[in-house]
Curated annotation (Swiss-Prot):
It comes from the Eukaryota. GO terms for biological process: excitatory chemical synaptic transmission; gene expression; inhibitory chemical synaptic transmission. GO terms for molecular function: calcium ion binding. This is Parvalbumin alpha. The lineage of its organism: Eukaryota, Metazoa, Chordata, Craniata, Vertebrata. In muscle, parvalbumin is thought to be involved in relaxation after contraction. It binds two calcium ions. The modification N-acetylserine is found at residue 2. It comes from Homo sapiens. The modification Phosphoserine is found at residues 2, 24.
Amino acid sequence: MSMTDLLNAEDIKKAVGAFSATDSFDHKKFFQMVGLKKKSADDVKKVFHMLDKDKSGFIEEDELGFILKGFSPDARDLSAKETKMLMAAGDKDGDGKIGVDEFSTLVAES
């Protein structure tokens, strides 16, 4: 399964392009622009599992830096600042990683 099986390729392209400048990433706007906010809880979980590259059941900080590439392979990496801000927004229990429920909450709050 690929991201375009769940989300519109044109929406992904526009969203990735909107945040092409370093330190411009806004997860709330991004999740809305790619159409993730409108998806079912099941589809949000499928996206989480695609972003969890090492299949640990969590998105760790190193994976989080590549989150845009999870949507589009030619997208940029997040800056260290953006990665830390996204982790702070998503890591509700403070364990240094984002679980599937935390990711679902992060998307729902956007």
